[in-house]
Amino acid sequence: GTCAEQATTRDRRLQVPAGSGSLKVWKLGDVIHSTPTVVAGPKDRHDAIYGDQSYSAFLQKWYNRRQVAYVGGNDGMLHAFNAGYYHPGDDASASAPANTTEHGWFTTAPAANSSGAPLGGELWGFVPYELLPQLEFLSRADYQHTYYVDLPLKVADVRIFTADTDHPNGWGTILI
């Protein structure tokens, strides 16, 4: 495009790899103050710290749940990415060379040979209702940077739910 066109439109394309001439659209809004946060199995250990034995059933049920990485972007969305299922290095076979350590690995589904969402693939994006009217600013030629979902995230195991199969004894994990 001409210099005049470039001055009046926002371009979210990048050369990938740099200098290749191949342009790809950068799909994720900038992340400035929102720290990516991974939610894995329950970790608050209310049973051990506070002696609350009602937490144990929740811990056991969700100990090996899918790990999800969350981050807020200045595209107005909270993003959730598949971080997979962790499998510890557990090959005790006689075929392993002596003095070797098998490291753990991540897969897309609980069973090592099954398929699921690709590792690093976006599971979903959520736009808070209050931001919907403001998203139009992103497409304006005179766009000035706006901070949307741009604060650190907090994760906690809490006992606020109605007890059911997904929430043993009312426990669940929330993201704030």
Predicted segments — roles?
Residues 1-176:
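A fold-level detector for beta-propeller and closely related beta-sheet-rich head/sensor domains
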